[in-house]
Every structure is written in structure tokens, then in C-alpha cells.
Regions:
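Non-catalytic terminal extensions of ATP-dependent helicases
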Residues: 156-235
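RNA-recognition motif
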Residues: 1-5, 64-66, 200-209
Length: 235
């Protein structure tokens, strides 16, 4: 689908400050616990935005080409499995990544051209889903010419909600396919040794040398206590 799909609603978010960090924080708090991809034009901006949000105790992660591959994989996995509902990224995430269910796209920086705009917006409102795109502009910035300038201005609620806490957390296991470990082994271990019920375990992703498991956040502390020192399949 292109950037103009009727299922995609575009909003303009006006910032009175040239530095848009505070208005981004306010927007993300208002959007709540919904899968949101925030696009910046530069790697250092991604790191700066992520650092600002995390310092304000806002749960988010980052994704850009300067990161090590395992760190990029971990960030994407947490975003996919619901451990982290907000991902701050360069245009690296605008194409080719399979991340279903993204509800919001935020343009922290205006896209460099129409193609980038189309690819960014193409992350949401996919197939039969609907989605929202938010363009953050300083009050003196113009809407890029390839975007209709009669877009609706986003109105913030009078009372700003607190940051939403993710329902899931990610458990990292330092063994994977090379160790003959599979999903059934991991889930069985979590049920038997970790006291987890079926609804406490979410997405399981087994890589060559390690695995990620989504666990209900409220049960993570109890799980770590129960499995400390235990082995999966004797490894």
C-alpha cells in the first residue's frame, strides 16, 4: 500500500520548540500502549531521542545501521513481541522488515523525499489494518510539498497520561539451534521449572546461538528466581 491508503490517517503535530523531544514524549504518552515506529533522519538523532525518552522512564528501544547485529535483532524482537511498544529508528526500518501490527508511524524529522515518506508510512495500515501517521513540525516549518497541507492538526488532551508499561518482558537464553534447542524444549522448561502457565508465555524465537522468549512482565521476577541454576535439556 502507498502513503495515501485510505486506511491511513495523517496528523500534523505542532511543536512550539525547535527541539521536538518534549512534544514527542507528550505524543507517545498520549498514544499509550500501541505499537509505534518513530523515524529520525540520522543515527545520532535516534540515539539522542532514545536517551531522552529512557531518561524520562519511557520504555523504548532503538534501531539503526551502526548497531551490532545481535543488538539490532534484540531490539526488533522486543518490538515484535510486545516487550517494547516504541521503536526509534532511521529509515533502515522503513522497508524490508517484517513487523506486523504497527499502529502508528511518527515522523520526528520530515522524510528526506516522497519515496522515504511512502516507505515509512507503508509500515502501518497494511493489508486490512488501519493506522495513523504523525508529522511533527516546528511552528515555523512547512509541510513538505509532496504532502497535502490541509492535514488535521493533532489536539492533545488536557491531562497527559503517564507512560504505558509493556505487558511483556523478554527473557534471553544463551543457547540456540546449534545446541539442538527448540521452542518445545524452551516452553516445556518454563512450564515445568518456571511455574509458567500458557498465558504467561508469548512469542518464542530461537536463533542459531541464542533464543528470546516473551514472558508476562508481572511474572518475570518469579520466573528468574525459580529457574536460577536450572538447565534446559542438560545444557
Amino acid at each position: 500500500p502507498d502513503a495515501l491508503t485510505p486506511r491511513l490517517k495523517l496528523h500534523k503535530v505542532v511543536s512550539s520548540e525547535k527541539d521536538k523531544l518534549e512534544i514527542l514524549y507528550n505524543l507517545l504518552c498520549t498514544l499509550g500502549y500501541h505499537s509505534t515506529l518513530v523515524f529520525c533522519n540520522y543515527r545520532d538523532s535516534v540515539e539522542r531521542v532514545t536517551g531522552y525518552l529512557q531518561a524520562k522512564k519511557f520504555p523504548c528501544d532503538m534501531f539503526h545501521g551502526g548497531m551490532e547485529q545481535p543488538d539490532r535483532e534484540r531490539a526488533l524482537y522486543k518490538f515484535r513481541n510486545g516487550s517494547c511498544s516504541v521503536l526509534i529508528s532511521t529509515d533502515l526500518a522503513a522497508r524490508g522488515l517484517d513487523i506486523p501490527g504497527i499502529e502508528n508511524v511518527v515522523h520526528y524529522h520530515p522524510p528526506v523525499n516522497e519515496e522515504a515518506y511512502t516507505h515509512r508510512n507503508g509500515r502501518t495500515a497494511r493489508w486490512e489494518a488501519s493506522g495513523n501517521a504523525y508529522l511533527i513540525l516546528h511552528e515555523e516549518e512547512f509541510v513538505p510539498e509532496y504532502i497535502s497541507d490541509d492535514i488535521e492538526t493533532y489536539e492533545f488532551p488536557e491531562v497527559l497520561p503517564k507512560p504505558a508499561k509493556p505487558r511483556w518482558a523478554t527473557l534471553y537464553i544463551g543457547k540456540g539451534k546449534k545446541d539442538k534447542l527448540n521452542k518445545i524444549d524452551i516452553v516445556g522448561f518454563l512450564y515445568k521449572k518456571g511455574g509458567m502457565a500458557r498465558e504467561d508465555v508469548g512469542q518464542v524465537d530461537v536463533k542459531e546461538h541464542y533464543a528470546f522468549v516473551a514472558v508476562r512482565r508481572s511474572k518475570m521476577k518469579q520466573l528468574l528466581t525459580l529457574i536460577r541454576g536450572e538447565k534446559i535439556k542438560g545444557i
